[in-house]
Amino acid sequence: MSSSDIFDVLNIRPKSSSPDAEAQTPTPSSGTVKHNKPQVTGIQRELYSLLGDNTPTVPIKQGNKFKDSLNSNIKPSPWSFVEFEANSHLKLRHWVKGSKELVGATVEPSSFAKFNQHLTIPSFDEQEFQQFMNGNNSEWKYGEVQYLFDLCRNYDMKWFVIADRFNYNGTERKLDDLKEMFYTVCQWYFLYKDPDNPLISQLNFPKEKELERKKYLERLLKRTAAEIAEEEALIIESRKFEMAAKKTLQEREALLQLLDHPHSDKPISQFLTSQGMSQLYANLLNDKNRKRKPDSNTPENPWMKQQQQFAQQRQQIQHQQQFKQGQIIQQQQQQQQQQQQQQQQKQQKQQKPQSDQITSKDQQPSENIEVKTEGQRLNKKQKIELQNALRRKQDSEYAEHLLEKFTLEERKALGVIAHGEKLAPGVYLRSSKISTYKPAVQNKIVATLQELGLPVRPAMPSLEVVQEHEKLLKKIATLLELKKQVDKLTAEKQIVK
């Protein structure tokens, strides 16, 4: 198969090398520069020869992108400048589509007149006013009431505008007085005209409640920032109590469900044998080890959340204090190293050639080392004591921070105490923590208590009783010590005599 056959199959026309074709090709002008194209050989030549006209897959509509010219044959529609009636005493003009013949010469109302709605306020004359009022209000006369009703019609019951514009023969009326008079007159009017009207019950205006509401609002607006914060804190506390009450109710219901278990109808004879007892024990053990789903409806405990926040704050304070302690320890170590270097420099300057001095110098370093080791030990002890003191201080500050919102009376009522020192783990009796003295002093204290008619240990060792008992023991011990010193001085005085 030749190349011409391939061209015929692929519908490709080969390049003709006839002289007629060469003659038809345009000759370049003298001014243009002829660029020789590189000759393509091999596969590239075959690929170039396969290229033909690429037809687009999607038809492209090549239309004119400019706007069409205006059609001047269409006749423009006429517009006319006509009058319209805005209200009964005002006429304006506007443009309307259409000729004057079509629109007409009559003045039409505004298209927005349908939105101009007014309230239906009752109207009456002086005779009707005297009949339905029947002398119920002697302060307001008919002229002033009619003036008020006219203002209400003109300003659509905008009471602040009405109170601002009200000026009847120089009389001053407050906004609440105007409201009260308007609603009372309307109520008496409907009672006179239509006693069965359902609007009568809604026309009652409580003036005293309105004044009280405004005073309360003024007090709210005049609150200080401290009062607002106090109210917010009280609201938060009340919500916490509500959450705690809900939780206690849920726990109480759970306990009642546990206590009020359903009675089984099965006989107990099957559990009287050893096999039945072992089966019952296995069932109870499986029930105990079974994982129960946590109750998702239980509310979050606000006290636990607050304690977690306090614990986080406490950890931050501890980290800061530990960082400060580390800086202080580093400074102390640097000062000690500087002192040691200064001592070594002084010792090197004071060297002498004598043998005694040499021996003494040989002994000095060992002594210095011993002194340094003792100093280092003392420093370590001091560091440990300082750390313990700081920890106790942090614990006491944390406890006081937790209880700062409780007063002394509330602490006493709840029995809450902030211990400054670390307590021993486990349960103990408060009476066992009463301080004891030496046997000789203890016997004298017991004798003194018996003389006073008091027991050695309190019968009801509450917190306050134990504190007062401790104070009493300390005072008795100091008095016994003073008595001992007085007896000693009197004996010496008698010997001198």
Curated annotation (Swiss-Prot):
Principal subcellular localization: nucleus
This protein's GO CC annotations: NuA4 histone acetyltransferase complex; Swr1 complex
One of the record's GO molecular function terms: transcription corepressor activity
Segments traversing the membrane: none
Disordered: annotated span: 1-38, 286-317, 344-377
Ranges of biased composition (kind: Low complexity): 306-317, 344-358
GO biological process: chromatin remodeling; DNA repair; negative regulation of transcription by RNA polymerase II
The organism's place on the tree of life at top rank: Eukaryota
Keyword ATP-binding listed: no
UniProt xrefs under InterPro entries: DAMP1_SANT-like, Swc4/Dmap1
Localization: Nucleus
Function: Component of the SWR1 complex which mediates the ATP-dependent exchange of histone H2A for the H2A variant HZT1 leading to transcriptional regulation of selected genes by chromatin remodeling. Component of the NuA4 histone acetyltransferase complex which is involved in transcriptional activation of selected genes principally by acetylation of nucleosomal histone H4 and H2A. The NuA4 complex is also involved in DNA repair.
Family: Belongs to the SWC4 family.
Subunit structure: Component of the SWR1 chromatin-remodeling complex and of the NuA4 histone acetyltransferase complex.
Protein name per Swiss-Prot or TrEMBL: SWR1-complex protein 4
Gene expressing this chain: SWC4
